[in-house]
Amino acid sequence: MSDVTLARLFRHMEWANQQLFAQLSALPEAALSFSAWNPDWTVGKLANHIAIAQGRLISRVEKSQAPEEIEAPLTSQGIKDLAKKVAANDKRMQELLNTPDEMRTFIRYGEEVSYLTSTIMAQFVHHATEHRAQIADILAANNMDVVNLDDIDLWSFERSERN
């Protein structure tokens, strides 16, 4: 299933995730508790959710048991540790890019569902992108406009690869 575009998307996602987590680890720890439209979804909760969901998605591709879902502490060190977990997950999914595109059956929201491997892999990239944007928005809504999504887009990624 792998091709040059797909590989680039996954490398970009890995890079963008690390850029975001580096920024989050440098913020005042209080910022990790910021929320906006939904008080349950804080910056720290979303950061944890990226890593937890990655583990689930990898297990679906591998047809294995999902890893235990443990949230990292909402501290600078907790975010640094989470960044390592996300990096390992990103690398693992990239190793799986040549997995055959076939139906995978698993439990989602308590129901048995089936999706193609390619859909699960596309969701891996989309999910991280979606939540990086939400984190940037929440921080901006709390007068901390520190994550510029243009700085972690594909154009910026290519420039970083050239340097």
Predicted regions mapped to residue ranges:
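Acidic catalytic patch
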Residues: 97-111
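Short, contiguous alpha-helical
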Residues: 7-71, 111-163
